[in-house]
Amino acid sequence: DTRSLSITMTSSSARFPDITNHWARPFIEALARRGILNGYPDGKFRPDNSVTRAEFAAIITTTFSKIPKKREYVPFVDVPDNYWATSAIKKAYETVFITGFPNNYFRPKDRIQRINALLSIISGLGMTSKVSTDLLPVLGQIYQDASKIPDYAKPTAAITTRAGMVVSHPNPKLLNPTLAATRADVSAFVYQALVWLGEEKAIPSQYIVDPSKFDVPTPPPGSVKINPKREFRGAWVASVWISDWPSRAGLEAAQQKAELIQILDKLQELIFNALILQVRPEGDALYESKYEPWSAWLTGIQGKSPGYDPLEFAISECHKRNIEFHAWFNPYRASTSYRRVKNVSPHIAETNPEVVYRYGTQLWMDPGAKVVQDKIYNVIMDVVQRYDVDGIHLDDYFYPYPINNLSFPDSKPYAAYRNAGGRLSLSDWRRNNVNIMLQRLWKGINSAKSHVKFGISPFGIYRPGQPAGIKGLDAYEALYADAKKWLQQGWLDYIAPQLYWRIDQTAQSYPVLLRWWTSINSKQRHVYAGNSVARLDGKAWKQREIVKQVGISRSLREQLSLGNIFFSASGIQENRQGITDKFKSLLYKEPALVTTMPWKDTIQPASPVAVQAENRKITWATGGGEIRSWTLYKKSDNNWILEQVLPKEKTEATVEPGTYAVCAIDRMANQSAGIVVTI
């Protein structure tokens, strides 16, 4: 029985005969005195035995028993009510110390890895927003095996090292991130967390990794390190059905450009920092493509050029305004209506009609067909390689939304799969088709341009009952979208669940769903809630609903809820129910940079050089490297207030008297040290 590690203390003795000369003895004895650890029936502790996830849950909940509940428990299918650790697992989940695996499994008997034990502790204690990740650039100096740290866990390694929580025996230069944590390891980690909390005194040990021994890049003389306000502030711009842009098909190029500039000017005025523009609504293209025809939503005729490249134009105009550009693709939809427009080659309905099915009035590509999988990959990678996009974005359309009494017509390819020896059920096969596509895209994008972000905005309900009380469409079974798996496998950089429901809508409650999405985020990706300004009607949906929803998103920042994306731009343009006024006066009063992604890049750019001040004008020059923009801060008491975000081409600013700092921002939104100047 391995359950002797924690929960209650059955002996008043704090000594175990097999730890007398063990490196972890002081940590073990200290925790035993607190009633956190106990030994086996034979009196031994067995410090080098590995720890299971169930045992770890028991230790954590005993040690940090005062941490408040942060989310509702969703019972795991492999943790029965009568299991010895069910209560501990439930509490560890509710307090965000630990999460599960895809398909609602917990795997209680799996051994917990050292890095995941550390990740669990900092998640439950909310350390991600309290401890600096400044050691990220020097992890390779600290740990000889830094290359073995999974990308998702690098911030964990930096935070726990900075907090003095990492203890490594016999060699503190090895983190051994993926090794199973031993009882001794866990004892040391937990004790060091108590030291960080101020609840225990430090124990001298040569195996504690001392962060002060390593050089972190320091700001140059006359400079200052500033932690900027960060929040993802995005808006969707839909082209399908003439939703947001252009206002109608067939407009002259100049008018199309003017309309898009009007949208971007409004977003800039409201201090948004990201645009998600639909560039492939139905197997077509709002850009020059050798793979697919020009979209009829642009010109009224599929295949007809609008006379310019809207994608290239949109990217350029966004970057002038310090707005990130994310290209939005619909992967499988071939036509919103087979009657609406004549498809022309190279539309897939013309080149490969055998893999395009009529479903209701729509045309839909078969996600299981290799020609479709290759087409999607080639189309998206073509954009990644040829255009200066900041992100690639997929929405909620995978397999089509179901039509009553109408099955998706892929019985023949599924039968062929089974005849070839495939064993997956139809539902699992369909989900696997989508998974293959997403994983391939994730790898391809990172290989081609590692700075390009990959995000998905799935339907806001994963499955009814997850979490408890939630009702609605089962995206897992109806759309074959296993968004929980994508997030937990780390196949994306951000997820933007479409939470188009009110806070008081019990069966689809906004805060309940958002907390659930943040709770399953074991790879520590970013969560940007999708909000609907399109629903504002002054009746069931009033302006204050959006205000409260943004507040809820911000309250979950420690759980990596780091922004919002609004559907859609037309509602913002119209100032529907006064929401635009509210953005300006309350929600987005101050500028903010987009959030950084430590698993992609953490290297700060060079600071600006030749910074001078004269006649209320500050001028500067680039210090080298690729710069996306500049930030200008003004000092107020002991705080630095972000005054302006300027495009890279602008290297001067006229200001009022005061003390300022100018910083460089790279394309991943990493910020340099600020160069201080006084006027």
PLM segments and residue spans:
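Catalytic domains of carbohydrate-active enzymes, especially glycoside hydrolases
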Residues: 258-284, 386-390
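Beta-strand-rich modules
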Residues: 653-671
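Active-site-adjacent "subsite" loops/lids of carbohydrate-active enzymes
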Residues: 227-232, 238-258, 327, 332-386
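Polysaccharide-binding and catalytic clefts of secreted carbohydrate-active enzymes
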Residues: 280, 321, 351-461, 465-491, ...
